[in-house]
A protein has these predicted regions:
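Active-site microenvironment for binding and transforming phosphate-containing groups
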Residues: 1-110
């Protein structure tokens, strides 16, 4: 397994694992550059569970997803409990946690 880091433009970077064949799963790991959040969350904070401005978090998510060719409205986010649980998501899960932390998938990290 290898990790590839690529520049998406506008100071946005994304990492990708070659673990999945072709386009079987769109995924990425974001860096902290290229967003709009103010300190101490600067700049590309995408976490709704901290005290960052939710509008800034939404704009950061929108920018990152747009750079990947995705709709931020359809992303599905876990609560990220720093455990080992990975969940399978389905089309019906599209948008869970995209704008509202209370709607995230419970007790999972990915």
């Amino acid at each position: 397994m290898s990790f590839v880091l690529r520049h998406l433009g506008n100071n946005l970077w994304s990492g990708r694992l070659d673990l999945f064949p072709g386009d079987a799963l769109v995924h990425g790991f974001s860096a902290r550059q290229g967003g709009v959040s103010a300190p101490p969350y600067d700049t590309l904070n995408m976490a709704l569970h901290v005290e960052d401005d939710p509008a800034a978090v939404w704009e950061n998510r929108r920018r990152y997803c747009a750079a990947l060719g995705l709709s931020a409205e359809r992303i599905c986010t876990p609560r990220q409990v720093h455990g080992t649980e990975i969940v399978r998501v389905f089309r019906r899960d599209a948008g869970r946690g995209a704008r509202d932390y209370a709607d995230c998938i419970d007790d999972a990290d990915a």
